[in-house]
């Protein structure tokens, strides 16, 4: 059986191609059945996210060309374009790749946790489609096991590697818990949207989004149960904010020293944590001079992020070692399964030969043939039948002077070797 991991991802293919060959959840069952029918895949899993589409499959004589052709035809894409932007791994390399993906080592953001859930869902879809057997059941359970171990035993996911998440983590570090904090976000771009989601996950007491265009602020706030403000309403509400995070495209500061100073006075100098993620700055640098204002800029956070990336890269080396060990364990199990299959086939073949000869003997007895003669004939035929294949193998090894195979056959058949001392 050939095990293959084939696909495209953010490192090998542009977003236009990734979009073209992505699978929706509704199409997954149809896709898996089509893959099995048209390529002969015995077992398969398809992982499809915004950053990758990968096919993990096992079959006799499965090739990258067959998978490329199938994927192109299923999505009406160009096979040559797919071929130029794809990659393929075989056997143990494929196993390691699957485990790396599930552990987040192959992700756009090193160590991101979402991919594990996506791989698990892909596996569930494959099971529901009836294309999972014992090999892939074992492979993916070991994959999930090593991913869990990587999460619990390394620092792969414990440090922020985006300024949005870093700002939330820094606020959490300062306030210990954010559940009693009022948060004001200024802006409505992608960064603020990410910050809003992270803050919502932390269970903040109150979340407000202020923006020049109220409709855009509402698009972020409404799904999270947050309130919205216009920029002109900020002065009246700033005193209520324990945490302020700003990221707009404004060419002039949104918050000046005087405005923040008045807000702190109204707060009776209760500390305020401010993060300026904008370039040019949204918050005047002089705000940092105020006793009860703790101002951080995008440069401060970038230093934290870079340090955290280094930490994750170190953790990734630890994770890779765990993957090597788990992949080796799976390969040993797989090899053991192959020997079990051979033994099962040998036993079935022997039992079939026995049953055939017994049936003939019983027929002879029913016809009145002498029992002693039937038993002797049965014994001779059974002996000849069982030693036929080993005899051929021994003769072949002897003729080819293949001492290694000769020794293996002698050991397997319990025969004393020619140079062994008699006992």
Swiss-Prot record:
Entry keywords, A to Z: NADP, Oxidoreductase, Porphyrin biosynthesis
CDD domains, sorted: NAD_bind_Glutamyl_tRNA_reduct
GO BP annotations, alphabetical order: protoporphyrinogen IX biosynthetic process from glutamate
Gene Ontology MF terms in the entry: glutamyl-tRNA reductase activity; NADP binding
PROSITE patterns in the record: GLUTR
Catalytic activity: (S)-4-amino-5-oxopentanoate + tRNA(Glu) + NADP(+) = L-glutamyl-tRNA(Glu) + NADPH + H(+)
Pathway note: Porphyrin-containing compound metabolism; protoporphyrin-IX biosynthesis; 5-aminolevulinate from L-glutamyl-tRNA(Glu): step 1/2
Residues involved in substrate binding: 49-52, 107, 112-114, 118
Site (Important for activity): 97
Positions that bind NADP(+): 187-192
EC number: 1.2.1.70
UniProt-annotated catalytic positions: 50 (nucleophile)
Gene3D superfamilies, A to Z: Glutamyl-tRNA reductase, N-terminal domain, NAD(P)-binding Rossmann-like Domain
Keyword NADP: yes
Enzyme's top EC category: oxidoreductase
Notes concerning its domains: Possesses an unusual extended V-shaped dimeric structure with each monomer consisting of three distinct domains arranged along a curved 'spinal' alpha-helix. The N-terminal catalytic domain specifically recognizes the glutamate moiety of the substrate. The second domain is the NADPH-binding domain, and the third C-terminal domain is responsible for dimerization.
Additional remark text: During catalysis, the active site Cys acts as a nucleophile attacking the alpha-carbonyl group of tRNA-bound glutamate with the formation of a thioester intermediate between enzyme and glutamate, and the concomitant release of tRNA(Glu). The thioester intermediate is finally reduced by direct hydride transfer from NADPH, to form the product GSA.
Family the UniProt entry places it in: Belongs to the glutamyl-tRNA reductase family.
Physiological role: Catalyzes the NADPH-dependent reduction of glutamyl-tRNA(Glu) to glutamate 1-semialdehyde (GSA).
Quaternary structure, from the entry: Homodimer.
Protein name, UniProt field: Glutamyl-tRNA reductase
Gene: hemA
């Amino acid at each position: 059986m050939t095990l293959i991991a084939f696909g495209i991802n953010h490192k090998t293919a542009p977003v236009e191609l990734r979009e073209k060959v992505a699978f929706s959840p509704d199409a997954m069952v149809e896709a898996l059945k089509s893959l099995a029918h048209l390529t002969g895949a015995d077992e398969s899993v398809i992982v499809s996210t915004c950053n990758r589409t990968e096919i993990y499959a096992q079959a006799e004589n499965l090739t990258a060309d067959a998978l490329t052709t199938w994927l192109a035809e299923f999505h009406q894409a160009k096979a040559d374009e797919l071929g130029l932007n794809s990659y393929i791994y075989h056997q143990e390399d494929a196993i390691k790749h699957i485990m790396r993906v599930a552990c987040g080592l192959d992700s756009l953001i090193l160590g991101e946790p979402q991919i594990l859930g996506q791989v698990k869902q892909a596996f569930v879809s494959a099971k529901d489609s009836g294309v999972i057997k014992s090999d892939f059941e074992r492979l993916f359970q070991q994959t999930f096991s090593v991913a869990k171990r990587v999460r619990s035993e390394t620092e792969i996911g414990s440090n922020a590697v985006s300024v949005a998440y870093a700002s939330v983590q820094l606020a959490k570090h300062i306030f210990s818990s954010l559940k009693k904090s009022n948060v004001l976000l200024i802006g409505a771009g992608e960064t603020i949207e990410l910050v809003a989601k992270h803050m919502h996950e932390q269970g903040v007491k109150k979340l407000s989004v202020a923006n020049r265009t109220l409709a855009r602020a509402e698009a972020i706030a409404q799904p999270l149960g947050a309130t919205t403000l216009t920029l002109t309403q900020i002065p009246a509400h700033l005193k209520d904010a324990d945490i302020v995070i700003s990221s707009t495209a404004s060419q002039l500061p949104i918050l000046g020293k005087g405005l923040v100073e008045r807000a702190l006075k109204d707060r009776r100098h209760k500390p305020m944590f401010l993060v300026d993620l904008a370039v040019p700055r949204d918050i005047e640098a002089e705000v940092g001079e105020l006793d009860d204002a703790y101002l951080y800029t995008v440069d401060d956070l970038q230093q934290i992020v870079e340090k955290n990336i280094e930490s994750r890269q170190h953790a990734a080396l630890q994770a890779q070692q765990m993957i090597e060990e788990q992949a080796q364990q799976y390969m040993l199990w797989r090899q053991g399964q192959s020997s079990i299959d051979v033994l099962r086939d040998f036993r079935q073949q022997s039992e079939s030969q026995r049953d055939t000869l017994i049936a003939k003997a019983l027929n002879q007895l029913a016809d009145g043939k002498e029992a002693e003669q039937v038993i002797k004939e049965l014994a001779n035929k059974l002996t000849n039948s069982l030693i036929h294949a080993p005899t051929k193998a021994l003769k072949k090894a002897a003729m080819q002077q293949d001492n290694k195979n000769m020794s293996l056959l002698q050991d397997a058949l319990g025969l004393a070797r020619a140079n062994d001392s008699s006992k």
